[in-house]
Amino acid sequence: DGVALQAIKNSNVASTFYANSVPALKEMPEELRARCEGKKAHFEYDHKKWADVSKMHPMQRITMQFLSLNKERRAMDMKLIQKNRKGIEGIYFHRLNNMTVEGDETLVQDLYDWMFQDKYVYEHKWEDGDIILMDQLITQHKREFVAEELLERRVLHRFTFMVNNDDEWVREQQNSF
């Protein structure tokens, strides 16, 4: 899947940081890479980690509540080392979705420490009108922590480009376990 973020209004109150897992994986120490090879991580969506639903638009709140209640959509397993549709290898990493790796209690933190080194991270300082396109599979992003009252004024539009479930690439991902 891909995502586009477009800065609409008051976007300069917080930067977004993008971690590129492609060079992080290429330069990863052998010991850490060996711990990732063939492993899958379990992710469980937790809306409480994402946003304060009391401040959301009513339709957003309903969507978040449905995601929270729908056990099939709430949890998933994904390979740590992934290839995107273009065949580029990287790491799928998503700590905010209660990420765990069975049998390796410290791997999530070790991956975070490795992937979010300054040399793998780009900081985008937003200006209204900016558009960022990203690969959601092997690129991770996080927002700078700033005062809530500043974020309440910021408007970014998010567009998601979904992969068709009939696609051969999707079948390969599902059959890889």
Model features per residue range: what roles?
Residues D1-I131, L137-F177:
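Non-heme Fe(II) oxygenase catalytic core, chiefly the N-lobe of the double-stranded beta-helix
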